[in-house]
Amino acid sequence: MKKKGIIFLLCSLLCGCAAAPTYETLGGDIHQAAISLKEAVVSVPQGATEMAMEQGTYWVCDDFDMQVQILSGGDLGETVSALSGLDVDSLTVMTSAAGEMVRYEWVWTAMSEAGQMLCRGLVLDDGAYHYCLTAIGPAEQGEKLNSQWNDIFSSFHAV
């Protein structure tokens, strides 16, 4: 009986002595999963004429024109400059959160053959892509455009 007790005691002491698992690691940097391209969605005014372009879609509306583009992410200054023709430092760019994205918005004026134009830009940045919305219309219709653009710009998102 004494032998059985000692054997039982030794077995119970040794049962937790299993070999530790060996983990293997692979060399190289750990890369984050790539962010997939999303679709840009916007509420388009009724009666707008759509024109497909190389880098997005352009709509001619009754009082203004608007365009949606998806550009490579990265330098916001380059994107703002490409959309507005102005240096980002010469504009007041408002920043806010839009879900998991960052929302950048600004306005500017420009001269054209038709006269002074009011312009508005918006960029949604997901870290990999810039989802861009721009609108342009006659500056003398500023109040009317602002009302219409508020609805359109608030509807803009990427899914």
Residues of each region from the PLM?
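Signature of long, low-cysteine stretches enriched in small and polar/charged residues
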Residues: 84-128, 136
